[in-house]
């Protein structure tokens, strides 16, 4: 593709030439936007050309964005600081143990016992407790649903272990149990009855 000037008829004036020739465009603006291809001088050096073509705009700095004086910044931070002070990050305490995604969350007595402020709840802790009570209802329902299949699984493992010990130590009876792959879950990953018999 070529540039627009190559496609323009000879008699027509291109947009760049019209912008350069127009007296309104003498300040470096093109279609209402300032051109930034090196035509403008840096603001730090000497006088800059007037933005609107008038000398009044260059002298007036009331519309320019200025940094706030330090006293106003301190006042603004002073307003925010009291709000941030009571919102200290606190450790979340669970009143009831629950399971979420197979993980068990239980209250740790060591953390709660050493802290004297934990024995007398403050207003914020009471509000947090009310908010957590609402969220605990949803997690408790999820925990019950997750706990039922997991609680049945350890009972089944216990039944298999007791059946294996009652039947005896024969290799023929241990064969079917060894053929069934069992996946250990969580802290109950002790030796399975089949592996215990093989070790003997």
UniProtKB/Swiss-Prot annotation:
Residues carrying Phosphoserine: 22, 36, 48, 71, 93, 101, 104, 119-120, 132, 135, 151, 162, 165
Domain of life: Eukaryota
Alphabetized Pfam families for the sequence: MARCKS
Compartment list: Cytoplasm, Cytoskeleton; Cell membrane
Topology class, membrane: Lipid-anchor
Lipid group attachment sites (N-myristoyl glycine): 2
Induction: Up-regulated in peritoneal macrophages in response to bacterial lipopolysaccharide (LPS).
Example GO BP: positive regulation of cell population proliferation
Subunit structure: Binds to filamentous actin (F-actin), but not to monomeric G-actin, independently of its phosphorylation status. Interacts with calmodulin.
Protein name: MARCKS-related protein
């Amino acid at each position: 593709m070529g540039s627009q000037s190559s496609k323009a008829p000879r008699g027509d004036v291109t947009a760049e030439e019209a912008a350069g020739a127009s007296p309104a465009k003498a300040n470096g603006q093109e279609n209402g936007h300032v051109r930034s291809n090196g035509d403008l001088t840096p603001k730090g050096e000497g006088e800059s050309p007037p933005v609107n073509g008038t000398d009044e705009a260059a002298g007036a700095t009331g519309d320019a964005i200025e940094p706030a004086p330090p006293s106003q910044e301190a006042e603004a931070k002073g307003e925010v600081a009291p709000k941030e002070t009571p919102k200290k990050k606190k450790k979340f305490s669970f009143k009831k143990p629950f399971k979420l995604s197979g993980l068990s969350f239980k209250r740790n007595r060591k953390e709660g016992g050493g802290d004297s402020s934990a024995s007398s709840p403050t207003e914020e802790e009471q509000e947090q407790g009310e908010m957590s009570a609402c969220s605990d209802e949803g997690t408790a329902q999820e925990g019950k649903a997750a706990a039922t299949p997991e609680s049945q699984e350890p009972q089944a493992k216990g039944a298999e272990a007791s059946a294996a010990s009652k039947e005896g130590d024969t290799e023929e009876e241990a064969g079917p149990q060894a053929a069934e792959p069992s996946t250990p879950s969580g802290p109950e990953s002790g030796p399975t009855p089949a592996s215990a018999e093989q070790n003997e």
